[in-house]
Design a protein with these regions (language model features):
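Extended acidic, low-complexity intrinsically disordered regions
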Residues: 1-743
Length: 743
């Protein structure tokens, strides 16, 4: 569990919080194998036996004061007595992980779900209202997925278009049963329930014995023809192009189908839904005409109109999926408007991921799904953050849903080691921290389940397909941290973690954009940076009448703040906040919202302000980081650059590079080694591109050199982009200072 705070020295009072203008909160990556310093938790048993405070329900930790008969809660100060069992346990403190470490991960006895067959279940739902190219990509992706699945897993193959296809691959020849989707939305469901068409255990096949048959079934998949879709919907062939992708009906039926096995056959089923376009048939169909209309409309802001969901169907369906133990990952492969603003809820609210690929030609989908299945994940998670009594959690951010009864309790359906969540803080009362010498305490409890293989061998030592067993383990992970209140504003500034500040800022601006539009979101970000600059100058300036030209917007006396203007400028230039008029596809904006709101702070900072590294040769690094400007490239005089944008890795050879340097760089050089390591350390597969300046089109690489670009997107300037942005911040900061002097 990694926990990073925006400031390591907390503001001592509400006045100090307002005066510093810094975001106050934490970013939490609960299922990370190590903490933010690289240290693993202390593990053990007894997660169900840790004493809890009678007043605030916090867990006993190594930060608590222990006495012979009891302990004092580190969060609220309540004195709690030990029961007989705890008293006996704590007579041997060395055997109690919670007394020796502030970061523990303990198994909960008897909470593993006795009687539940904890079989890993995976289902592929494939769109057949598609092109041949799309289908070939999906076949490649599913073959990669089969290699990543552990033996003993169950796998089901379903297709959808104007009908649902269920595949039974457990016999010698793949058998498919079709159920037609009614085109009339007023009809009540399918004519035949999926369970009646094919029993669930015939649909779910053991991967270890049926892998070849599953692969054979994939080879039989063909796109449905326009004639076939027209005949099913009762239209003539030339009218069929309007319909044929019954995604909503198919997902609703699949969730109901799988729900019969929840708690008996499986504890969690993961569905991979592959889409080639917007649902346009049956329940949950989406009207994609609103995208075209926004271009031509007058008086309607496309920067606002295309961000909210069109219908609540998929959000409601996600709630049903959660109750059925189903997690859905959506893989959309299309450059057409698909309305991900509506579809995203089915994935992120059921614990899944949303992926978007513009085309099938150079898609990283096979690598992404293999990577997704190869990393460990937890499910059925409950995340709870508690604080000491002087402050409390305010807003919470991330792909979870709040508990309907308890505050600051979030439920996470499926969580991997990259998934990150955020909280901001507020004071409980106007006095702030009542005793500035005492540390503020944050405790994060994360209860989760994992499936662990427990192989059984036959008498002769061989492993039969039926002998793969899995056990369901319930665990409790607790992290307790202390933060000292700052004595003054300068201490707060000196303790800032700019990546975490950006992390919470991005969460806030995403919500603002969905609610009020991209323009308002951009305004909010610019206004915050201007306020931060004004507050910084007010704190450090001895003369309140500081002239405008003397306002320090580079935070020259505080290294921890110096990267923030660049990060904010890059955020405003990112597709997340670029205006619709610049050609940002609304689905791509939604994809970035979903991706960015799940990233940990360092990855998010890289996605917002990419890392540019120079090399003097493929085997020698020249400089670890440059600003994103053409001037930086010219001044460096290095011939080779590696640009890491998180989603892309671009190797750029300048036109002046030595012709003897091999292009692309050889696989055994330092540059390639660096690339391979970067690809391994992230949740998605970055797309690798090689560009030779002077010979290849350099537009992609140059588009990331943002510091010469106008922040409002009016076009490239002669180099005044970031400079002009700084001046605009200086002007607004000066106005804030003058207004407060006048008042």
């Amino acid at each position: 569990m990694a926990v990073r705070a925006t400031v390591s020295r907390f503001p001592a009072t509400p006045e100090a919080l307002e005066s510093c203008a810094v975001q106050w909160g934490v970013a939490v990556t609960p299922f990370a194998a190590v903490d933010e310093r690289g240290q693993p938790p202390t593990t053990g048993a007894g997660g169900d036996r840790i004493p809890r405070c009678e007043h605030c329900w916090a867990y006993l930790s190594s930060h608590c004061d222990l006495e012979r008969w009891g302990w004092t809660c580190a969060l609220c100060g309540t004195l709690n007595g030990f029961d007989d069992e705890a008293e006996r346990r704590f007579q041997r403190p060395d055997a109690c992980p919670e007394l020796n470490s502030s970061f523990v991960d303990l198994e909960i006895a008897g909470a593993g779900g006795d009687g539940v067959q904890a079989l890993p279940v995976y289902v592929a739902a494939v769109d057949l209202a598609c092109s041949e190219e799309f289908l070939e990509l999906i076949k490649s992706a599913l073959l990669a997925a089969l290699e990543a699945l552990i033996p003993g897993s169950l796998f089901g193959l379903m297709t959808f278009s104007h009908k649902i296809g269920l595949y039974d691959v457990q016999g010698p020849i793949p058998l498919v049963k079709n159920v037609f989707i009614p085109p009339d939305l007023e009809e009540d469901g399918l004519p035949v329930a999926l369970e009646d068409a094919m029993p669930l255990l015939s649909f779910l096949a053991p991967v270890d014995t049926c892998k070849d048959r599953i692969a054979a079934a994939l080879e039989t998949l063909r796109p449905t023809s326009s004639w076939e879709r027209g005949a099913a919907s009762g239209h003539e062939e030339d009218a069929v192009l309007l319909g044929g992708r019954g995604f909503g009906t198919a997902m609703s039926a699949l969730i109901e189908y799988l729900s019969s096995g929840y708690g008996s056959t499986f504890a969690l089923a993961r569905v991979f839904a592959f889409l080639s376009g917007a649902p346009d048939y049956g329940a949950g169909l989406l009207d994609t005409r609103r995208y075209g209309e926004q271009y031509a409309s007058k008086g309607v802001d496309a920067n606002l109109a295309l961000l909210p969901e069109q219908i609540p169907f998929y959000r409601d369906l996600a709630a049903v999926a959660v109750q059925s133990g189903v997690c859905i990952d959506i893989f959309a492969v299309t450059d057409e408007y698909t309305d991900l603003a509506s579809l995203k809820f089915l994935s992120i609210e059921s614990g899944g991921y949303l992926f978007l690929y513009a085309n099938a030609d150079d898609s990283t989908l096979p690598q992404d799904i293999y990577r997704l299945l190869s990393r460990p994940y937890a499910f059925g998670c409950v995340l709870r953050l508690r604080t000491s009594s002087d402050f409390e959690p305010g807003n919470s951010y991330g792909h979870f849903f709040p508990d309907p009864q308890y505050e600051s309790v979030q439920h996470i359906i499926c969580c991997d080691s990259f998934a990150t969540y955020a909280y901001d803080f507020e004071f409980s009362h106007n006095n702030g921290f009542s005793r500035h010498t005492d540390p503020a305490v944050v405790q994060i409890a994360f209860q989760y389940s994992v499936i662990e293989p427990a192989k059984e061998t036959s008498g002769d030592g061989s492993q039969s397909s039926a002998s793969y067993k899995f056990s369901l383990k319930r665990r409790l992970r607790i992290r307790t941290l202390q933060y000292r209140p700052a004595r003054n504003i300068s201490e707060i500034y000196d303790s800032v973690d700019p990546e975490v500040v950006l992390h919470i800022l991005v969460h806030k601006v995403i919500l603002e954009c969905v609610d009020k539009g991209v323009r308002e979101g951009r305004h909010q970000v610019h206004a915050w940076l201007s306020l931060l600059a004004a507050r910084y100058n007010q704190v450090l300036s001895s003369d309140v009448r500081t002239p405008l030209s003397s306002i320090d917007i580079d935070f020259s006396q505080c290294p921890q703040l110096q990267t923030i203007p660049q990060l904010v400028f890059a955020l405003l230039r990112s597709p997340l906040l670029r205006l619709h008029e610049e050609g940002v596809h609304p689905d791509y904006r939604i994809y970035l919202q979903c991706l960015f709101s799940a990233l940990e702070p360092s990855s998010l900072a890289k996605a917002i302000y990419p890392v540019l590294i120079s090399y003097s040769s493929p085997d020698k690094q020249a400089f670890p980081r440059h600003t994103l400007s053409r001037a930086a490239l010219i001044m460096s005089e290095s011939p080779i650059f590696l640009l890491d944008t998180f989603t892309n890795l671009i190797v750029y050879y300048s036109s002046t590079a030595d012709p003897s340097f091999p292009f692309p760089p050889p696989r055994d050089c330092l540059l390639r080694t660096t690339i391979n390591k970067l690809k391994q350390d992230r949740c998605i597969t970055p797309k690798l591109t090689f560009i030779h300046g002077g010979e290849d089109d350099s537009t992609l690489f140059e588009s990331y050199l943002i510091e010469e670009q106008d922040v409002d997107g009016s076009g490239l300037t002669t180099g005044s982009g970031f400079v002009a942005f700084r001046e605009s911040v200086r002007n607004v900061a000066g106005e804030i200072i003058q207004e407060e002097i006048g008042s």
